[in-house]
């Protein structure tokens, strides 16, 4: 289960990525565009269904294309919504909407 956290600056994302190299923790990044209806619906669903209080939940950092357009280049994101999951074994990338919902447990 994930707990949503909205990122506001690219500097925040860069710090998270840098710390990930050392810590190897499980967490995710969701790239969205709030101009897109599918992304809007997904973010509303995340806000209503995913909890922010659970201690065992993994952080899900949500990145908006309007606020951080250059962040999309890092993972070669061309479709939105795009879910990147950092797991101990590596990195998983998913950009099919139904699979994004499935991976998030929605």
Q: How should each PLM-predicted stretch be described?
A:
Residues 79-106:
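Non-catalytic, surface beta->alpha helical segment in thiol-disulfide oxidoreductase systems
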Residues 2-17, 95-96:
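Short acidic-hydrophobic, aromatic-tinged amphipathic segments that line or gate anion-handling sites
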Residues 16-20, 71:
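CheY-like receiver
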Residues 41-42, 96:
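Residues at alpha-helix caps and immediate loop-helix transition turns in enzyme cores, especially N-
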Residues 26, 44, 81-84:
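Proline-centered helix-kink/hinge sites
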Residues 4-11, 30-37, 43, 47, ...:
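Thiol-based oxidoreductase modules, predominantly thioredoxin-like and allied folds used
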């Amino acid at each position: 289960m994930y707990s949503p956290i909205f990122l506001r600056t690219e500097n925040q994302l860069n710090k998270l990525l840098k710390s990930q190299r050392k810590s190897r923790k499980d967490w995710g990044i969701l790239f969205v565009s709030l101009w897109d209806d599918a992304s809007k619906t997904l973010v509303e669903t995340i806000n209503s269904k995913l909890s922010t209080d659970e201690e065992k939940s993994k952080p899900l950092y949500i990145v908006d294309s309007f606020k951080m357009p250059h962040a999309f280049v890092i993972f070669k994101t061309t479709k939105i919504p795009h879910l990147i999951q950092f797991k101990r074994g590596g990195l998983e990338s998913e950009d099919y909407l139904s699979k994004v919902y499935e991976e998030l447990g929605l």
